[in-house]
From Swiss-Prot:
Region annotated Disordered, chain positions: 675-730
Pfam families in UniProt: ARMC9_ARM, ARMC9_LisH, CTLH_Armc9
Keyword Phosphoprotein: yes
Gene name, Swiss-Prot/TrEMBL: Armc9
Superkingdom in the source lineage: Eukaryota
Species of provenance: Rattus norvegicus
Name of the protein in question: LisH domain-containing protein ARMC9
Classification via InterPro entries: ARM-like, ARM-type_fold, ARMC9, ARMC9_ARM_dom, ARMC9_CTLH-like_dom, ARMC9_LisH, LisH
Residues with the Phosphoserine modification: 583
């Protein structure tokens, strides 16, 4: 009974709302009357939902009419009366729309009074806008998109000011009106569905699926919790041990000052306590700690990372049967096979095991990149099944994460064309688009593919996508900005940007202030690159780009500040710097700087789960698809020291985001181990120390490195890396 009383008002409100919706007028009157007689509270709005108004269409028309006529008071009275405060105050899209609506009414007289606005009314509108900026609109003052408009009330003639040129274009008001109409349609459409009906529809199958997902998430969370608890207990024990040893060492130092000697036995006991468990027994009686330097040398040696153990090769597979089932099998089988093939690559040990897996895929043409048949494995990118499309995109992205995999995929331009088509068409599944975008971004490390993407107009598509960065996932945002930067480093790409210079500069300036700081190196690199074009420099000066950049100098860290200073210097230069423009004539590949990365995102948020008795993963492959001698080894390429970059300068070389977001770094050939890969599914692998990249020069190509989050933030304008110990293969 207590639960009923606690929610009585909302429950009665649900009934009242449905009776009103179904037009049970007499029943509704009787119900309301009886509730009043019994003193039962009636919730006016259910669950904070929108006001239910039978005249919602009329309200929409009145709002649009007030917008068209410039009736500011009527518009905002209707706006505040019929759009719930829960949406106006918390929804970012509603807040942005309201900001632009205030601008619309503030400049309405300037646009539609024939050049002779009523001065008193104009001052009142500007004053109203200023009050809004100082109160409710103050929350958006940290957003780059709106920053210039805070100066609007103080500009004598906004119509001629370059920062506000866009507001007075003929297309600005119709575009804003269209956004308003879409917003109102969405809001009032939601208001017309009674919550009782929604609850009824959602009951049943949706709840069952959600319970299964929650159960799976609970199991994974419990596994992670156990792993973290063990790690925590070990760290706590090590910490207590260190504190104890430290206290003893302090006592020993004090004793030494008093003239007492430290015995070799005591020194040996302290060192053994500090060594790893594996070394304690062997060292206790075999090392002479009386020799000077022995103890410190052994301590440092105990901290060295363990060498990777030799691991066996994975069993050979029957690739003919695999490809046949990938083409003709059921959608569920296709999805499980694609998942298993990806896992075989992502969870294999770096080194010979992973290289053998990759070479087997390539030598058996797993994706039919060289096939001319009408039906091929590649066609799965256009499957009607969402799971198959997504898992195919994940596998392609995994292959593109490795240099040899990129070379395999790049040999046929149809792979690039299919990925570009999937990228532009995929609007249902976010993860599919993320993986397609990730693969294309890694493709952009190779010059011929850069050229093809530029010719295909991908730069324009990326600019359009990045106009609304808040609607994008972190992965999509980072990889799209990094891809845009890589394409902008080519002279052909810069010339493409010059065709839409104003829009390109606006998008990049908005991204400078985005809350995702991982994109800053790519934004800075793109800006620095395109500002080598005189026409883009002129456009940037006209829009006050230097003032915008200096705003960020006040808030940025040291590396960010130095990078922005480089960009400002480029902006104010008159002549092109030597070597800035890179020739497009040479399309030869330089694979010496094409590196490997296997980020944990490849295996995140798995869409399918095996049912009881259903095979998946490596067990599916080795049970149903064992082959004979299909693994073909290949001599491993040995690397040289990587070309490095300086955190003081903007990026000038093609890169890929790699492990910036996940914080799972890669060092040289030591990619994520199988143990770390498994941990990556439950969280994040142990970080491996990374080398800091140092000094990229213009005109070379295909470097990709990777850094830990800390190293990225300490070099925010430095090059994002695909493999931090990036090595040049001979």
């Amino acid at each position: 009974m207590g639960d009923v009383l606690a929610h009585e008002s909302e429950l009665l409100g649900l009934v009242k709302e449905y009776l009103d919706f179904a037009e049970f007028e007499d029943t509704l009157k009787t119900f309301s009357k009886e509730c009043k007689v019994k003193g039962k509270p009636l919730c006016k709005t259910v669950g904070g939902s929108l006001k239910k108004d039978s005249n919602s269409l009329m309200i929409q028309k009145d709002l649009v009419a007030a917008f068209d006529s410039g009736d500011q008071k009527l518009f905002f009275d209707l706006w505040e009366g019929h759009i719930p405060s829960s949406i106006r105050d918390t929804d970012s899209l509603a807040q942005k729309l309201e900001f632009y609506l205030h601008i619309h009414f503030a400049i309405y007289l300037l646009k539609y009074s024939g050049g002779r606005p009523d001065r008193q009314e104009l001052d009142e509108r500007i004053s109203y806008f200023k009050t809004y900026l100082e109160t409710k609109g103050a929350s958006l003052s940290q957003t780059t998109e709106f920053l210039p408009f805070y100066a609007l009330p103080f500009v004598p003639n906004p119509m001629v000011h370059p920062s506000f040129k866009e507001l007075f274009q003929d297309s600005w008001t119709p575009e804003l009106k269209l956004k308003l109409e879409k917003f109102l349609a969405l809001i009032f459409k939601a208001s017309n569905t009674p919550k009782l009906l929604t609850i009824y529809k959602e009951n049943g199958s949706n709840n069952k699926e959600m319970l299964q997902q929650l159960h799976q998430q609970l199991l994974e969370a419990e596994r992670r919790a156990m792993a973290y608890l063990k790690r925590y207990n070990k760290m706590q024990a090590d910490y207590h041990s260190l504190i104890g040893v430290t206290a003893e060492l302090v006592d020993s130092l004090e004793a030494t000052v008093s003239g007492k000697m430290i015995t070799p036995e005591y020194l040996q006991s302290v060192c053994v306590r500090l060594f790893s468990n594996q070394m304690r027994q062997s060292l206790a009686h075999s090392v002479d700690f009386t020799r000077p330097g022995t103890a410190s040398t052994m301590l440092r040696a105990s901290l060295a990372p363990e060498k990777l153990k030799d691991v066996p090769l994975l069993p050979s597979l029957d690739y003919e049967k695999l490809k046949k089932d990938l083409i003709w099998g059921s959608d569920r089988l296709k999805a499980f096979l694609l998942q298993a093939l990806r896992w075989r690559l992502t969870t294999s040990h770096p080194g010979e095991q992973r290289e053998t897996v990759l070479q087997a895929y390539i030598s058996n043409d797993l994706l039919d990149c060289h096939s001319h048949n009408q039906r091929s494995v590649l066609q799965l990118l256009h499957s009607k099944s969402e799971a198959v499309r997504q898992y195919m995109a994940r596998l392609v992205n995994a292959l593109a994460s490795l240099a040899e995999g990129r070379l395999y995929l790049a040999q046929n331009t149809k792979v690039l064309r299919m990925l570009e088509g999937r990228l532009k068409e995929e609007d249902k599944d976010v993860i599919t688009r993320e993986n397609v975008l990730g693969a294309l971004q890694k493709f952009s490390l190779r010059r011929p593919l850069q050229t093809a993407m530029i010719r295909d107009g991908l730069i324009f598509w990326l600019i359009d996508l990045l106009k609304e960065p808040d609607c994008l996932s972190d992965y999509t945002l980072e990889y799209s900005v990094a891809l845009l930067m890589n394409l902008c480093l080519r002279s052909a790409g810069k010339n493409m940007c010059a065709k839409v210079a104003g829009l390109m500069l606006k998008v990049l300036s908005d991204l400078l202030g985005h809350e995702n700081h991982e994109i800053q190196p790519y934004v800075n690199g793109a800006l620095y690159s395109i500002l080598s074009i005189p026409s883009i420099r002129e456009e940037a000066r006209a829009m006050g780009m230097e003032d915008i950049l200096r705003c960020f100098i006040k808030e940025g860290n040291a590396e960010m500040i130095r990078q922005i200073e480089f960009i400002i210097k480029q902006l104010n230069s008159e002549d092109l710097l030597d070597g800035v423009l890179e020739s497009d004539d040479d399309e030869d590949e330089d694979d010496e700087e094409d590196h490997d990365i296997m980020e944990a995102d490849l295996d995140k948020d798995e869409l399918i789960q095996p049912q009881l008795g259903e095979l998946s993963g490596e067990k599916l492959l080795t049970t149903e698809y064992l082959g004979i001698m299909t693994n073909t080894g290949k001599a491993r390429r040995k690397g040289l020291a990587s070309v490095q970059w300086s955190g003081d300068e903007p990026l000038r070389r093609p890169v890929t985001p790699g492990g910036h977001r996940t914080g799972c770094p890669v060092v040289g050939d030591h990619l994520i181990s199988s143990q770390n890969a498994q941990q990556a599914r439950n969280g994040c692998p142990r970080p491996i120390p990374v080398a800091q990249p140092d000094d990229y020069k213009e005109g070379k190509r295909g470097v990709a490195g990777r850094a830990t989050p800390s190293s990225c933030k300490s070099a925010e304008c430095a090059e994002p890396v695909l493999s931090s110990g990036a090595q040049k293969p001979k």
